[in-house]
């Protein structure tokens, strides 16, 4: 199979349909563990009420998220509501920990699906070169969708470096008063990439991100065996 024949080649980043059902199960189980069976229903009632309040209070931000797709809008409102209600009950730090654990559990399933890793690894040609091309096409699609602004793409053979200088998630969550939530995508990647990298002979380094205080997101994909020993510094 040719790389370009993959259904997600050149598509923006998003949770594929097959992951969404699994995601709901992960979220439900996490809420049940966190708040207990007796606390689950009141928590959900508050989250639904908070989602309605967010849509009434911030139609401009909801519309901006919706301009990038219905899925983006739904996730923006839902995550903000979950975080606010959990913060009222547990405090902001614990609320973020709760959502981060959900995102990182989902990442174990979403990252292989986003990259169609079984098919990608079996495509004609060098697996790492195909992985680079898949990333370039995906980042270009995200740039066109307005989700990210990609400043530069550098491919020197054994390393693909992509610098992202703006991120809609960071901007939207900051504007609505929940800047912590901009980090969820970063933490999703930290859990998800290790699941797929061996399949495409790659290593991942990202020393800084916008959501975690950097001037840009510095994505680096190396051919396996050529990356610096700095994985522990990934952001």
Question: Residue ranges of each PLM-predicted region?
Answer:
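Amphipathic interaction/junction segments at domain boundaries or subunit interfaces
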Residues: 74, 78-80, 85-182
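N-terminal, charged low-complexity regulatory/assembly segments
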Residues: 1-86
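Short terminal or interdomain "cap/linker" segment that borders an active site or interface and mediates
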Residues: 147-176, 180-182, 186, 190-235
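Short, charged N-terminal helix-start/capping segments
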Residues: 1-20, 139-157, 205
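Hydrophobic transmembrane alpha-helix bundles
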Residues: 3, 50-61, 82, 129-142, ...
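A broad structural signal for alpha-helix termini and local helix breaks/kinks
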Residues: 35, 90, 197-200
